UniProtKB/Swiss-Prot annotation:
Source organism: Rubrobacter xylanophilus (strain DSM 9941 / JCM 11954 / NBRC 16129 / PRD-1)
Catalytic activity: N-acetyl-D-muramate 6-phosphate + H2O = N-acetyl-D-glucosamine 6-phosphate + (R)-lactate
Designated name of the protein: N-acetylmuramic acid 6-phosphate etherase
Known EC number: 4.2.1.126
GO cellular component: cytosol
Pathway(s) annotated for this protein in UniProt: Amino-sugar metabolism; N-acetylmuramate degradation
Chain ranges of the SIS domain: 57-220
Keyword entries, A-Z: Carbohydrate metabolism, Lyase
Catalytic center residues: E85 (proton donor), E116
């Protein structure tokens, strides 16, 4: 065990929760709510670094590369959670946004705590994905020292990929080996060392921002509407129709009919209705992927 582990911010004992087991339930709720409220502030302090990292990720995605999250334990699960949501939300094809967790798929539901200790396993998992210069790899580790994550990120660098490191400690090992270090320091946890709490919340918030903002930049939205939504169930089909209504001002029946003509693709239906063209012409105009570009509109600089 690393003798310096106890010196990490994420391992320290918070004086505010030193009497945790003696507090009443209401007091505990208020304490945890106060602590969680620190998370957005810590994330906001990294805004300039995050913007630079996201712009670099977008370059890789625009060139056909992948966004790959890698981590162990909570950090790995948060990455998988964000990755799997990108398909239905933004219509990205399988394998474009990937979550890799130490211990494999089983570790999502059954803890494989020892899996994080192998840097070789991290490197091997990246090799299996055939990571290359066109990809962006985001290593996630609250401590910034998890061997599995460090091994994966080092291998990603060796293979020429863009690397981003997300940790919750200042001056972490992870920060030292990536192109874009993000250090979201949220302070000691209410339950000392339990980084599934504030650190986990911070990781989820940052990954939400990386994926969502990247998709916005790639034209996967029109305004704040998810126009590339994959209408794969009743709820999402209804949402797609409402999106077409909101974007075009068309009544429900007209929006539904346009969606049917356009194979359920909200983006195509919007362009077809607004420009008065058929589905094929709408798809041609959407070749660059952006509704605004298809309509001849620009975005703010």
């Amino acid at each position: 065990m690393d003798e310096r582990l106890g010196e990490l911010v994420t391992e320290r004992r918070s004086p505010d929760s030193a009497e945790l087991d003696r507090m009443g339930t209401g007091e505990l709720v208020r304490l945890m709510a106060r602590e969680e409220a620190r998370v957005p502030e810590a994330v906001a302090r990294q805004a300039p670094r995050m913007a630079a990292a996201i712009d670099a990720v977008v370059e890789r995605l625009r060139a056909g590369g992948r966004l790959i999250y890698v981590g162990a334990g909570t950090a790995g699960r948060v990455g998988v959670l964000d990755a799997v949501e990108c398909g239905p939300t933004f219509g990205v094809p399988p394998g474009r946004v990937v979550g890799v967790i130490a211990g494999g798929r089983e570790a999502m539901f059954d803890p494989r705590e020892s899996a994080e200790d192998s840097a070789e396993a991290g490197a091997s998992d990246l090799d299996r994905l055939c990571v290359g210069p066109e990809d962006a790899v985001v290593g996630v580790s609250a401590s910034g020292r998890t061997p599995y994550t460090l091994g994966a990120v080092r291998r990603a660098r060796e293979r020429g990929a863009l690397t981003v490191g997300l940790s919750c400690n200042p001056g972490s090992r992870l920060s030292d080996i990536v192109d874009h270090p993000l250090e979201v320091v949220v302070g000691p946890e209410v339950l000392a060392g339990s980084t599934r709490l504030k650190a986990g919340s911070a990781q989820k918030l940052v990954l939400n921002m990386i994926s969502t903002i990247s998709m916005v930049r790639l034209g996967k939205t029109y305004g704040n509407l998810m126009v590339d939504v994959r209408a794969s169930n009743a709820k999402l089909r209804d949402r797609a129709r409402r999106i077409v209504e909101l974007a075009t001002g068309a009544p429900p029946e007209e929006a539904a009919a346009a969606l049917d003509r356009c194979g359920g693709e909200a983006k195509v239906a919007i362009v077809a209705l607004l420009l008065g063209v058929g589905p094929d012409e709408a798809r041609r105009r959407l070749a660059a992927g952006s509704v605004r570009a298809a309509l001849g509109e620009g975005r703010r600089p």
